Amino acid sequence: MFAPPLIRRPAAGIVLIVEDHLLVQITATARIEDAGLSTLVAGDADEAMAILTSRDDVAAVFTDIDMPGSMDGLALAAIIRRRWPQIQVVVTSGQRPSKAAGLPDGVAFFQKPYDYSNLVNQFR
């Protein structure tokens, strides 16, 4: 698992989970909320962008790389880093870390399957 240093830890605020698979959405939401954090869910990057432009309380984004829609998770991560540099970004994929070679600076990567306790610690 490759996880570069994070630039921000959301002690408060919402973790936006961007995932197109319902079971992964439900599980990630439950685990992150069980850790005492608030969540929102988006099914793709386009929905995530709509949420990010309409809210100012999102502190972190946890996104899959491979998703349907107009952009993948890497493109979403790059946009977030440019437009909202204060938002922590964590990306995930079932592919090997080379898939995440295009990670923007300050973005962490978790390869699926990941340990939820390690993931939750990224947001504390």
List where the protein language model places each region.
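Acidic, metal-coordinating helix/loop segments flanking the phosphotransfer/catalytic sites
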Residues: 41-60, 100
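Conserved phosphotransfer cores of two-component systems
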Residues: 53-56, 79-86
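Acidic catalytic/metal-coordinating carboxylates
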Residues: 44, 71-76
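Non-catalytic signal-transmission and effector/linker regions of two-component phosphorelay proteins
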Residues: 1-16, 22-23, 82, 86, ...
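Two-component/phosphorelay signaling modules centered on CheY-like receiver
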Residues: 22-40
